[in-house]
């Protein structure tokens, strides 16, 4: 007997796939949802990590801009109006979410130039 195979190795503490990837979004849950959602017969190991990273980036981007909008309005809490202002004022996010309606979001303040009063020139004698 060489003594191999019996004990010896201590099992390492479980580390989530989210923490391995350095993400906050749940990689395991996204993997489960991809499998259960009939998106394909099989789901690769990298797919949920990539998707979680993309979702986390988009969420961080929207929250950053919405936080700025809230601060501009002297508020400490982000409301749907701030989300609407953040998304519609950003060209790329507006294109991505063009078909999305945000409840209680309101509209962007916009007045067509032709509707503004004409500027009268002061006549000099």
Curated annotation (Swiss-Prot):
Localization in the cell: Nucleus; Chromosome
Record PTM N-acetylserine, positions in chain: 2
Region feature Disordered, mapped onto this chain: 1-21
Modified residues (Phosphoserine): 2
Glycyl lysine isopeptide (Lys-Gly) (interchain with G-Cter in ubiquitin) cross-link, renumbered residues: 119
Biased composition (Basic residues): 1-18
Free-text description of this protein's post-translational modifications in UniProt: Monoubiquitination of Lys-119 gives a specific tag for epigenetic transcriptional repression.
Any Pfam family hit: Histone_H2A_C
Record InterPro entries: Histone-fold, Histone_H2A, Histone_H2A/H2B/H3, Histone_H2A_C, Histone_H2A_CS
A GO MF label: DNA binding
The entry's keywords: Acetylation, Chromosome, DNA-binding, Isopeptide bond, Nucleosome core, Nucleus, Phosphoprotein, Ubl conjugation
Domain of life: Eukaryota
Xref: PANTHER family: HISTONE H2A
Family of the protein in this entry: Belongs to the histone H2A family.
UniProt function note: Core component of nucleosome. Nucleosomes wrap and compact DNA into chromatin, limiting DNA accessibility to the cellular machineries which require DNA as a template. Histones thereby play a central role in transcription regulation, DNA repair, DNA replication and chromosomal stability. DNA accessibility is regulated via a complex set of post-translational modifications of histones, also called histone code, and nucleosome remodeling.
Assembly description: The nucleosome is a histone octamer containing two molecules each of H2A, H2B, H3 and H4 assembled in one H3-H4 heterotetramer and two H2A-H2B heterodimers. The octamer wraps approximately 147 bp of DNA.
Protein's recorded name: Histone H2A
Origin species: Chironomus thummi thummi (Midge)
Source organism phylogeny: Eukaryota, Metazoa, Ecdysozoa, Arthropoda, Hexapoda
């Amino acid at each position: 007997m060489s003594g191999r195979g019996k004990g010896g190795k201590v099992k390492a503490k479980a580390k989530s796939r989210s923490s391995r990837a350095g993400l906050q979004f749940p990689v395991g849950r996204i993997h489960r949802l991809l499998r259960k959602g009939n998106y394909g017969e099989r789901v690769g190991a990298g797919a949920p990590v990539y998707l979680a990273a993309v979702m986390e980036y988009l969420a961080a981007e929207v929250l950053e801009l919405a936080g700025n909008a809230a601060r501009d309005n002297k508020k400490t809490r982000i409301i749907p109006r701030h989300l609407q202002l953040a998304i519609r004022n950003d060209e790329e996010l507006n294109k991505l979410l063009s078909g999305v309606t945000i409840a209680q979001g309101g509209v962007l303040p916009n007045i067509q130039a032709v509707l503004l009063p004409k500027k009268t020139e002061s006549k000099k004698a």
